[in-house]
Amino acid sequence: MMMLITMKSTVLLSVFTVLATWAGLLEAHPLGDTSDASKLSSDYSLPDLINARKVPNNWQTGEQASLEEGRIVLTSKQNSKGSLWLKQGFDLKDSFTMEWTFRSVGYSGQTDGGISFWFVQDSNVPRDKQLYNGPVNYDGLQLLVDNNGPLGPTLRGQLNDGQKPVDKTKIYDQSFASCLMGYQDSSVPSTIRVTYDLEDDNLLKVQVDNKVCFQTRKVRFPSGSYRIGVTAQNGAVNNNAESFEIFKMQFFNGVIEDSLIPNVNAMGQPKLITKYIDQQTGKEKLIEKTAFDADKDKITNYELYKKLDRVEGKILANDINALETKLNDVIKVQQELLSFMTTITKQLSSKPPANNEKGTSTDDAIAEDKENFKDFLSINQKLEKVLVEQEKYREATKRHGQDGPQVDEIARKLMIWLLPLIFIMLVMAYYTFRIRQEIIKTKLL
């Protein structure tokens, strides 16, 4: 009897054990599971480093990097470098999420060193190690964390297509996005999460401790094999011993729940304060802008001159063509006037004294003079016609809203030039006839 009870108890215990095991499995991996745990890829992630005795076989360390007390120390001493690369490439299809947990201890302040996280084409690694101990010529994404830029400690995103190497001296000007990030000499590690979703209109989002650093939909990674890694160097400034340490790295085949956290508390951005002083009242006004908005307000003298040239061109575009035609007409009339005046001067100076022996009558002489100088006498009529046409043109231009202060000014100057010429012509014509009359009287006498 006791044996039967013992056997029943053993069977029941086994049944309960199996049920409990299945319940645990179902809870951890339910049917059709879409949780973050099901998306975690152990082949592309770091295992628990606390219990690890050596660097996993699917990862490769370089330079001074080493596993120490549950973390991988990339830079363990002054002027040191370190790297950690995944040996196998990741075949990108549509989306992924990767998280790096790291910290920096041992130094705080400006330094020419930094730590870079890489997601680059497989063919670009590890050809060179000139950019923060990483490739200077790569095709993919680089996330740089350093404290050598103009805005202090920042996280910056860099993109390159592998066509030309990245210039380290211009890396801050070529960043497509960035955010402030206080990371130095902190006992609390920071987590950088990179999410890319091809199906969500090429969404690329970078988060720091669940806060959005930046995001964009203007970046698209082509399909292919990519290498994942991290490199660091602590630089030579002040011979610092800044230690960059990796605690955790997880890679997910898809977008996880934490990637969808709304940006309620945005990360801090640098602020620039500009003081404006009113010259008339002397009042001061402070305007606060982000560094990126302030850069948009800057304009060089060359750009200012180009803008002024465009404005001047638009002002003159409405009337310059018609005005040029009128000016050409005026110049033509002036040339004809000078030609006639030259002819008159020559005739008056070269004509011999007349006598009455030829039997020329006074009426015939006057008629002959009028015939010789009919072109000269018609100049006044032509000038009057030009002035009338110019006045009509000005009135028509005013009606069409095309006339401006410049046309009036030019017309006024032309009148100043033409009126003295007309007066001179009339005076010369008067004295010419007087001389002619005196000559006729002399003949009669």
From Swiss-Prot:
**An MF annotation (GO) of this entry:** carbohydrate derivative binding
Enumerate the Cytoplasmic topological stretches. 434-445
Do you know which SUPFAM superfamilies this protein is assigned to? Answer: Concanavalin A-like lectins/glucanases
Superkingdom of the source?
A: Eukaryota
Q: Name one GO biological process term.
A: endoplasmic reticulum to Golgi vesicle-mediated transport
Disulfide bonds, paired cysteine numbers:
179-213
Per the UniProt entry, the signal peptide is: 1-28
- Write out the entry's keywords from A to Z: Disulfide bond, Endoplasmic reticulum, Golgi apparatus, Lectin, Membrane, Signal, Transmembrane, Transmembrane helix
Q: Where is this region: Mediates the interactions with COPI and COPII coat complexes?
A: 430-433
All ranges on the Lumenal side of the membrane: 29-412
Intervals of motif Di-lysine motif:
441-445
Manganese as UniProt keyword: no
Q: Where in the cell is it found?
A: Golgi apparatus membrane; Endoplasmic reticulum membrane
Any Pfam family from its record, for instance, is Lectin_leg-like
The principal localisation class reads Golgi
- UniProt topology in membrane: Single-pass type I membrane protein
InterPro entries xrefs: ConA-like_dom_sf (IPR013320), Emp46/Emp47 (IPR016710), EMP46/EMP47_N (IPR035661), Intracellular_Lectin-GPT (IPR051136), Lectin_leg (IPR005052)
GO CC annotations? Answer: COPII-coated ER to Golgi transport vesicle; endoplasmic reticulum membrane; endoplasmic reticulum-Golgi intermediate compartment; fungal-type vacuole membrane; Golgi membrane
- Record-annotated L-type lectin-like domain positions: 36-254
Q: Where are the transmembrane segments?
A: 413-433
* Family as reported in the entry's similarity comment: Belongs to the EMP46/EMP47 family.
- Other notes on this protein? Present with 2900 molecules/cell in log phase SD medium.
- Assembly mode: Homooligomers. Interacts with EMP46 in the endoplasmic reticulum membrane. Interacts with the coatomer proteins COP1, SEC21 and SEC23.
Free-text comment about domains: The di-lysine motif confers endoplasmic reticulum localization for type I membrane proteins.
Quote the function comment for this protein: Involved in the secretion of glycoproteins and in nucleus architecture and gene silencing. Required for the endoplasmic reticulum exit of EMP46.
Identify this protein by name.
Protein EMP47
The gene is EMP47
